[in-house]
Curated annotation (Swiss-Prot):
Listed InterPro entries: Indolepyruvate_Fd_OxRdtase_bsu (IPR017719), IorB_Oxidoreductase (IPR052198), Pyrv/ketoisovalerate_OxRed_cat (IPR019752), Pyrv_flavodox_OxRed_cen (IPR002869)
Keywords: Oxidoreductase
Catalysis performed (reactions): indole-3-pyruvate + 2 oxidized [2Fe-2S]-[ferredoxin] + CoA = (indol-3-yl)acetyl-CoA + 2 reduced [2Fe-2S]-[ferredoxin] + CO2 + H(+)
Protein's UniProt keywords contain Protein biosynthesis: no
Pfam families, A to Z: POR
Annotated EC: 1.2.7.8
Protein name: Indolepyruvate oxidoreductase subunit IorB
Organism encoding this protein: Archaeoglobus fulgidus (strain ATCC 49558 / DSM 4304 / JCM 9628 / NBRC 100126 / VC-16)
Keyword Oxidoreductase: yes
Coiled-coil ranges per UniProt: none
Length: 201
């Protein structure tokens, strides 16, 4: 068994937290996990790319075209890292944009959401656009957007470990005052996925 997940977003969205939760959950289930952050991160707003490889793997980097799943916390970042997609990749795409300074300054143009989705669907039909940030706000904080998307992953994809392992990972890694909020966000994301909306067409 081998599962390749690439998590992309911008600094401050919790891409590293997302990958860390998934990795810890997989390890709790007794699975081999290798992770790699392959793009400069530190500053808020910079592009972030994290690879999570689970199962029969040694090398930390997912090869181009080798992702089984892409979690895109920001729409344009999904396009930036589309080289990892193939015709079977599941893409969970948070639709809330974070406009980069270059666009604000007028030196670059941010693509329309429909354009982004259309380009991704040229590679894989399995693109699921969802405003995960809105769901997170309903759970209590937009900062839980990444956890909403993890919940959706378990609703849409047959994962090799249970969502209860994710709950354990959240309890272990997050500050006690935000655990309940994040568990709620996880459940809301999962329920959103299993309800069949939005469709994965």
């Amino acid at each position: 068994m081998r599962l390749n997940i690439v998590v992309v977003g911008v600094g401050g969205q919790g891409a590293l937290t997302t990958s860390g939760i998934i990795a810890r959950a997989a390890m709790r289930a007794g699975l081999n996990v290798v992770t790699a952050e392959t793009h400069g991160m530190a500053q808020r707003g910079g592009s972030v790319e994290v690879h999570v490889r689970i199962g029969d793997v040694r090398a930390p980097l997912i090869p181009e075209g080798g992702a089984d799943v892409m979690i895109a916390l920001e729409p344009a970042e999904a396009l930036r890292y589309a080289k990892f997609l193939n015709k079977n990749t599941l893409v969970i795409l948070n639709t809330r944009k974070i406009i980069p300074p270059s666009v604000t300054a007028g030196t670059a143009k941010y693509p329309e959401l429909d354009e982004i989705i259309g380009e991704l669907r040229k590679v894989t039909p399995r693109v699921i656009p969802v405003n995960a940030s809105e769901i997170a706000e309903k759970a209590g904080s937009v900062l839980a957007t990444n956890v909403v998307v993890v919940g959706m992953l378990f609703g849409y994809y047959s994962m090799p470990f249970g969502i209860e392992h994710v709950e354990e990972a959240i309890r272990e890694t997050m500050k006690s005052k935000i655990v309940d909020l994040n568990l709620k966000a996880l459940k809301m994301g999962y329920n959103q996925a299993i309800s069949g909306r939005p469709s994965a067409v």
